[in-house]
Amino acid sequence: MIRIPVALPMDSYDICIDEGGLERLGEYLAELGKVNRALVVSNPVVLRHYGARVVRSLNAAGFETASVTVPAGERHKHLRSVERIYQAALEHRLERSSLIVALGGGVVGDMAGFAASTWLRGIRVAQVPTTLLAMVDAAIGGKTGVNHPLGKNLIGTFHQPCLVLIDPQVLGTLPPRETRAAMAEVIKYGVIWDGDLFKRLEQLPSLQRPDARTLTTLLVRSCQAKAEVVVRDEREGGLRAILNYGHTVGHALESATGYRRYLHGEGVALGMAAAGRVAVALDLWSPEELRRQEALIIKARLPVRWKSDIASEALLLRMQSDKKVEAGKVRFVLPEAIGRVHTGVEVPTEVLRRVLDTLRG
């Protein structure tokens, strides 16, 4: 078992990477002190695969346990789905000493975390991610939220989990497309924070389906990178903004296509391709390092262009609703070197439009 501490002033917790850890979830949570009830939030597919194992572990540790499902997919990440969690919390009589277990990918984690942060003005949540993307990103750091018709994650809170439990064994059932999409976030950490990780990715023969040992190594490096950033800036007052690299254009693409065309990681890959080109256009980044980034994205069989039916003007409009807009201006995270980025960069609209146009088709 590998334990990565997230040492925050008020809400410290551990990221535990444990083969077969689902069987021991109840033991991990029992260590946290008095908890009387647990509500497992999942989607129907994940609950069918892993729900019985998780509930059995929780019951064995003395929890009164119930479960509720929310629809799978980003397009269902809205307040109506969260209301299902509230209803289950009411029926199961969750108290302030109770907790919610988020069992699933990033959509489940975001909604379960949001529900936990608002139920009785805040109860504990344990993040148990079952996708690689959620393991390396969404489950860590305490961001929760749901979408609004005009933009992604516009409604949300900061609510740190009491535990992040990662069981790599569950990745054996993950579809190949999901694994590839998660690699976008791993590549992101290499660009924004860990140049050695970027070089390691370049050296690997394949990023499409890494072997178990390589995957665990990438998991650990990515979790460490995210934890290091969050510890330095829990509430995104400055440094943590680097984690938004690729997300401004990525979120706009996801939203503009109704969350049906691109997985989140695919959107991030496209967003990084766009941000990298913007950085080169502004003379902030070298064309050679842009080429290296795009080579890694392609190596993971991720897209670097989108279909021509997505109008640049539609993306520009979506970006105006981005939660990172300040004083009416869209702010970008742009690379300056592998392992280092600028934050809060205001990009001239004509430069951004030109880059978006070059990536269509």
UniProtKB/Swiss-Prot annotation:
Enzyme Commission no: 4.2.3.4
Cellular component terms per the entry's GO annotation: cytoplasm
Amino acids binding Zn(2+): E185, H247, H264
Protein name, UniProt field: 3-dehydroquinate synthase
Record-annotated disulphide pairs: none
Family recorded in the similarity comment: Belongs to the sugar phosphate cyclases superfamily. Dehydroquinate synthase family.
Record field: catalytic activity: 7-phospho-2-dehydro-3-deoxy-D-arabino-heptonate = 3-dehydroquinate + phosphate
